[in-house]
């Protein structure tokens, strides 16, 4: 007699997660709460304090947003190439994602320079201070993913030189999970920045 499988509760699904998955999701939850708290403080500090001061959103922030959106696309391609067992394309997509992350970070510093040239300093108006604080904390979180990307790149480089390692990579559920978690976290960082960028536009 066949028994219908009862749906698992959210707690049971949580218990069945790999420890790495649990850590990542809890970390994302914690990071999300930090950003929610800071965004709330940003809003209560007076979102329109910079209005009427002849300021504009830094061009570097605009370009960096495009770079991060593009990196989200390349991160998505990683999972597709892994499913195709195409390691060279997987490595290329990961490398492109990493490089776009580096470009994004450099452009963030350029954006801070533009803010300073406009007279918006970290110790000036509260709204101006939050522009630095929120974007800086976002960079800090993104750096963690970029460090992990370097580790994955080194692993993939060794894999291409060893057929056994390649076989293990494409058949090991743990390796599949690591790539999936990387893309999940990267897209999370994309989403956080897009929300911040929208608020930054409103502040000007």
Where are these regions (language model features)?
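...captures the hydrophobic TM-helix bundle architecture rather than a specific catalytic motif
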Residues: 1-204
């Amino acid at each position: 007699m066949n028994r219908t499988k009862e749906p698992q509760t959210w707690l049971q699904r949580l218990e069945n997660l790999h420890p790495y998955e649990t850590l990542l999701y809890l970390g994302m939850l914690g990071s999300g709460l930090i950003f929610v708290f800071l965004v709330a403080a940003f809003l209560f500090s007076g979102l329109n304090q910079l209005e009427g001061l002849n300021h504009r959103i830094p061009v570097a922030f605009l370009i960096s947003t495009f770079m991060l959106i593009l990196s989200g696309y390349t991160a998505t391609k990683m999972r597709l190439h892994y499913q195709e067992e195409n390691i060279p394309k997987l490595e290329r997509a990961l490398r492109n994602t990493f490089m776009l992350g580096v470009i994004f970070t450099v452009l963030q510093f350029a954006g801070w320079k533009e803010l300073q040239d406009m007279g918006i300093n970290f110790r000036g108006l509260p709204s101006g201070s939050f522009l630095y604080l929120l974007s800086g904390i976002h960079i800090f979180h993104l750096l963690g993913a970029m460090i992990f990307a370097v580790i994955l790149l080194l692993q993939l480089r060794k894999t291409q030189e060893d057929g056994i390692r390649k076989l293990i990579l494409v058949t090991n559920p743990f390796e599949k999970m690591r790539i999936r978690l990387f893309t999940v976290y990267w897209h999370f960082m994309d989403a956080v920045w897009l929300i911040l960028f929208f608020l930054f536009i409103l502040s000007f």
